[in-house]
Amino acid sequence: MSKVTVQDIEAVDDYWGPTFRSILEGNNTKQIGDQLEQRIRSHDKEIERICNLYYQGFIDSIQELLQVRTQAQQLHNEVHSLDTSLRQISASLIQQGNDLVRARQIESNLASAIEALKSCLPALECYMKFTQQAKNKQYYQALRTLETLETEHLTRLKTHNYRFATQMQIQIPIIKENIRRSSASDFREFLENIRKFSPRIGELAITHTKQLQKRDINAIIAEHMQQMNGGEAGGAGAGGDDDGANVSAQDLIDFSPIYRCLHIYMVLGQREYFEKDYRQQRRDQAKLVLQPPPNMHDNLEAYKTYICAIVGFFVVEDHVKNTAGDVVTSSYLEDLWSSSLTKFVNEISMSSSSCTDPNILLRIKNLIMLSINTFKCYGYTVNILWELLHNMRDHYNEVLLQRWVHVFREILDKEQFLPMVVQNTEEYECIIERFPFHSEQLENAPFPKKFPFSRMVPEVYHQAKEFMYACMKFAEELTLSPNEVAAMVRKAANLLLTRSFSGCLSVVFRQPSITLTQLIQIIIDTQYLEKAGPFLDEFVCHMTNTERSVSQTPSAMFHVARQDAEKQVGLRICSKIDEFFELSAYDWLLVEPPGIASAFITDMISYLKSTFDSFAFKLPHIAQAACRRTFEHIAEKIYSIMYDEDVKQISTGALTQINLDLMQCEFFAASEPVPGLKEGELSKYFLRNRQLLDLLILEEWSTYFHDYGKQENRYHLVQPQSIIVILEKIREADKKPIFSLVRKNDKKKLLETVLKQLKHIADRQN
């Protein structure tokens, strides 16, 4: 470091730090300071020398400078004046230049703005168009415009990065969703309107079908020619004749929402979703439409609204199928129709089965017929509806039968069941017109004329024809052949007469107020009604335009009623016989009988004679049956009167009196009280009584015991136990003093012996 010189320090150009560090770290600071002093003095001398050398030149220069100073000042003034003048002159130019620059800049900016606006204008115009379309609910067109905006215009503006374009790009999905929701809302409103107007649409479709059914081919051709020749004027005139004739579903319902919604979902790529949603919504609506209103069974308007709503529903579906592509497919519609038809048939069947008004049922049938024809016009299968009508026909006939039961009851309640008498020709002809009856004897007879039947006969015959006509009304247009219709009407008529009317007659038969004479007249009336059966069949043939075919023999029509009547005749006579026997008043301890039959027997026989004579020739079979039943009952009464538990004693005289009464009855039976009976047929009913009384009176005990158990037995109908009961009553009577005096001891012994033997035989039988 000691070797460092001032020259070394001066030679350092870059960084003096190391040099100063070495100086400070060394011990030769004083030496370096001396060197620096010497160096400074050397430089001062050099400066002085140079100054002395150039001093004269400097003085000269100063002098020249002083000389130039005046000129410079003058020049300065001139320059300043010139500058001021130039400034004044150039100020306007500078202003104009600046204005020109600004104008050029504005012009450039305007050109750029115009160019930018030109590039943005299609997008803005497209957006304005979309906004207007959306405001007018032209959603499909709006989506198309939005698609153009998104795919064309906004794509071109991506490079410019406009904020409004970016905002539009962000808003487009939201706008699409809003459009979808708005169109879906319109679609829901459309579905609600469809549901509301379905009954009206169905009613118009049914009305149109009804009008078409009334028109023939000539009228259709004439109308077509009129439309061809008359053009629009003719069409307008035709439309004015009938306000609702040409109104269709699209006239009542605006179907544009479904088309718009379909197109919107197509643009959004959600067509399949829309189709599924539409079908599901319509299925749900079908369930609501198929729900019948409450208390529909007896409300015709409810039936009409219900049926029209279903018809309108499927008319709308058919229209959508034909106009909206695959929204309603054939398979979907067939499936919906099949399930809905089954539900519809079940509801109508259940409701109509509770209906008891044939007029309502007939109108329901007409509504269903019109709906069938309407459905057929739209291509729907309706076979199950025909089955429904056939089932309703059976129920309708049953309802008619119930109604005619009330009609018959009213007729029978008012009837006196006496032969009808007419006073003049007008009344006579009125009866002949209402009932097919011809009798020359009656026709030639003078007035007043007496018919063999009561007023009930023509009334019932007329009501039977009315019933047939009512049955025929329902069978019209049921795709049945005339023979099938005729068979149906005959079957219903047979049920009417054999079941309903016969049932009413059976009720009348059992009325206590009906006398035997009236009962017999009713039976006679039924015979005339049976004879009128072929005329009823002829009436059926005339209504159905078929050949005559008797389905049931007239004699069998009131078979059940006649059996009941025969039974009632027998019961009435037997009841009268019981009244006579209540007057018997036998003296069971009679010693000697008067020798004649009892008075009640004589009165009873007189009654039976007059009774049988009154209808034996009119009703021979019934008279014969009643006669058999009567004599059987008399025999049972005579037999039971001896075995009455209240009768404790029977004298021989009492037995003789009973024998006289029995003989009187046997004589009456042998006198053929009713023609046509076999000889001895009635006497057999008294045979048991005869054998018993003969055995008791004749006392042929040896014969009885000898023949007992053999085939040829004179007293084969008399059982030992029966004889024992009577003999014990005779023995009790013999205990009386009046009989003890006259009865011999051997008679008593004989009676005891007979009783022992009879009891022995009875014990063996047991």
UniProtKB/Swiss-Prot annotation:
Effect of residue 663 to A: Disrupts interaction with RAB11
GO-annotated cellular components: axon terminus; cytoplasmic vesicle; endosome; exocyst; recycling endosome; rhabdomere
Gene3D superfamilies: Dsl1p vesicle tethering complex, Tip20p subunit, domain D (1.20.58.670), Exocyst complex subunit Sec15 C-terminal domain, N-terminal subdomain (1.10.357.30)
Main location as per UniProt: other
Compartments, as annotated in UniProt: Cell projection, Rhabdomere
Tissue note: Detected in developing rhabdomeres in photoreceptor cells.
Highest taxon of the lineage: Eukaryota
UniProt GO MF annotations: small GTPase binding
InterPro entries for the chain: EXOC6/Sec15, EXOC6/Sec15_C, EXOC6/Sec15_C_dom1, EXOC6_Sec15_N, EXOC6PINT-1/Sec15/Tip20_C_dom2
UniProtKB keywords: Cell projection, Coiled coil, Exocytosis, Protein transport, Transport
PANTHER family in alphabetical order: EXOCYST COMPLEX COMPONENT 6, SEC15
Protein family according to the UniProt entry: Belongs to the SEC15 family.
Role description: Component of the exocyst complex involved in the docking of exocytic vesicles with fusion sites on the plasma membrane.
Subunit structure: The exocyst complex is composed of Sec3/Exoc1, Sec5/Exoc2, Sec6/Exoc3, Sec8/Exoc4, Sec10/Exoc5, Sec15/Exoc6, Exo70/Exoc7 and Exo84/Exoc8. Interacts with RAB3, RAB8, RAB11 and RAB27.
Protein name (record): Exocyst complex component 6
